A protein has these predicted regions:
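Single conserved hydrophobic/aromatic residue that forms the stacking wall/gate
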Residues: 1-7, 12
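A structural signal for short, well-ordered beta-strand segments
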Residues: 88, 121-123, 163
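Conserved GNAT-fold acetyl-CoA-binding loop/helix
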Residues: 21, 25-48
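Conserved acetyl-CoA-binding loop-helix of GNAT-fold acetyltransferases
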Residues: 92, 98-115, 133-138
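Conserved GNAT acetyl-CoA-binding A-motif
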Residues: 113-125
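Acetyl-CoA-dependent GNAT
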Residues: 39-95, 106-107, 166-167
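Conserved beta-strand-loop-alpha-helix junction that forms the acyl-donor binding cleft
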Residues: 97, 123-133
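Conserved catalytic-core motifs of GNAT/GCN5-like acyltransferases
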Residues: 72, 122-125, 137, 142-159
Length: 169
């Protein structure tokens, strides 16, 4: 089984948008993990990938040539003073969860963010997403907030928690 990380220093390929769109749309349509409610087109996803990866680290995980997960950093807030803080995002194909891929992706992302002199990373997680919360805790993130009933999806009010990882002392 061949596995590889493809990232921003190598380039995200246009063809990756197809797999990334499929992975993300699964979470949009069938879960409360993403707060988006309408599936994205490949064109929309490619546009996002190009925009994000031009400024921030973006990594894709492949197994046997198939994209099964991805993660990236992006702006946490738009004001200039926040420029050394980034928000993290990680998604895996549901068939590939629980195999350590999310950990590998996030470790690479954290390393790259350190190399780019980010000071802090923030993960905004749906409170019911136990797997993501556990992943972030294992990676050293600490919960710093809990917002109650801030999202409505599938006729259900959802809480969101923020986790923070300080990259420098």
């Amino acid at each position: 089984m061949q596995r590889s990380l493809v990232g921003s220093e190598m380039c995200i390929r246009d063809r990756d948008a197809t797999a990334i769109t499929k992975i993300y749309n699964e979470y949009i349509t069938n879960s409360i993990i993403s707060f988006e409610t309408e599936p994205l087109t490949e064109e929309d996803m490619l546009s996002r990938i190009v925009q994000i990866s031009s400024k921030y680290p973006y990594f894709v995980y492949e197994t046997d040539g198939i994209v099964v997960g991805y993660c990236y950093a992006h702006a946490w807030k738009e004001r200039a003073a926040y420029r050394y803080t980034a928000e993290t995002t990680v998604y895996l194909s549901p068939a590939y969860t629980g195999r350590g891929i999310g950990t590998l992706l996030m470790q690479k992302l954290i390393e790259e963010c350190r190399n780019k002199n980010y000071r802090a990373l923030i993960a905004c997680i749906t409170d019911d997403n136990i797997a993501s919360k556990s992943l972030h805790i294992r990676l050293g993130f600490k919960q710093v907030s809990h917002f109650k009933k801030v999202g409505l999806k599938f006729d259900r009010w959802l809480d969101v928690v923020d986790y923070e990882l300080l990259l420098t002392p």
